[in-house]
Amino acid sequence: MNELDSLVDAARRMFADAATPTDLENAKAQFLGKAGRVTELLKGLAQLPVEEKKSRGAAVNVAKQAIEQALNERRQALADAELQAQLQAEALDVTLPGRQRGQGGLHPVSLTLERIEGIFGSMGFDVADGPEIESDWFNFTALNTPEDHPARSMHDTFYVEGGTASAPLLLRTHTSPMQIRHAVQHVKKHRALLDAGQPMPEIRVIAPGRTYRVDSDATHSPMFHQCEGLWIGENVSFKDLKVVFTAFCRTFFESDDLVLRFRPSFFPFTEPSAEIDIQFQDGPLAGRWLEVAGSGQVHPNVVRNMGLDPEKYIGFAFGMGPDRLTMLRYGVNDLRLFFDGDIRFLSQFQ
């Protein structure tokens, strides 16, 4: 075996011993690098006589090609081994049972509605339900809303087919109609007591659900949720409203130092009326007054439309937006995110 054959054999053995691509590149440098043994042989050709240079150069090139071939074969072998190891690591056992699709979770607004119902349920409030397509009487007239009130216009309300000119049908603009329906049924149930001059059990109810208005922007949607509350009895005062709603807000936001403010306002169905603001004492919203609800003492005309004597029965009502409460609770700035159906966004609340 001559010198060049020994060189090729040494390169093959060293390449075969290389366990990683890095080891192989280090071995390559010893033979084909700038200071490698083959490179040195090629540089030495310049010192040979012309007659010998041609034959010697051809022999060195043959050895170089053999070394490069051995190098490429080892590279491919290492790549194949790496791929095989990766495939084995990622191999699927087809005898295993299939993976079940992950279960979904409740929508963040649904979580808020459940929380609201739970808190008021602990205070003795019932939960009312009712139709989303409502009559003009339950949605407006029974709630002391004047015929010329702007809320009755098509610019604010979605009217639907099926009604008459004197009794149109519409998508309810608030959940107050459910309160009226609940109160009317409650009064019918206890009519015998009322006729006998006996006290009727108090009406305590909340009415959560979807409502509809002609509106759409970052903080409003044509479909939104609302939850209204009603407490009617013989000795229910504005003080009770403050106690109940303060307890609710502090429980909902888990903040015992939450501050509430009642600002004078106007609603057709309550008198006096007040907007309710809250103020957090810490966190990113600390120090700001944030409107969360409207409220007031139920107007005598509304009490009368329930079938009760407003001289004897009195109470309070409030209305809040669960969507708004959800935004405040989770720090979301755009209401439309809740209804775009983006799983990436909604999955954060599961």
Curated annotation (Swiss-Prot):
It comes from the Bacteria. Coiled coil: none annotated. GO terms for cellular component: cytoplasm. Binds 2 magnesium ions per tetramer. It catalyses: tRNA(Phe) + L-phenylalanine + ATP = L-phenylalanyl-tRNA(Phe) + AMP + diphosphate + H(+). Its cofactor is Mg(2+). One of its GO terms (biological process) is phenylalanyl-tRNA aminoacylation. Its EC number is 6.1.1.20. Keywords: Aminoacyl-tRNA synthetase, ATP-binding, Cytoplasm, Ligase, Magnesium, Metal-binding, Nucleotide-binding, Protein biosynthesis. It holds the Pfam family Phe_tRNA-synt_N. Its main location: cytoplasm. PROSITE patterns: AA_TRNA_LIGASE_II (PS50862). InterPro entries: aa-tRNA-synth_II, aa-tRNA-synth_II/BPL/LPL, Phe-tRNA-synth_IIc_asu, Phe-tRNA_ligase_II_N, Phe_tRNA_ligase_alpha1_bac, Phenylalanyl-tRNA_Synthase, tRNA-bd_arm. Mg(2+) binds at residue 271. SUPFAM superfamilies: Class II aaRS and biotin synthetases, tRNA-binding arm. Belongs to the class-II aminoacyl-tRNA synthetase family. Phe-tRNA synthetase alpha subunit type 1 subfamily. This is Phenylalanine--tRNA ligase alpha subunit.
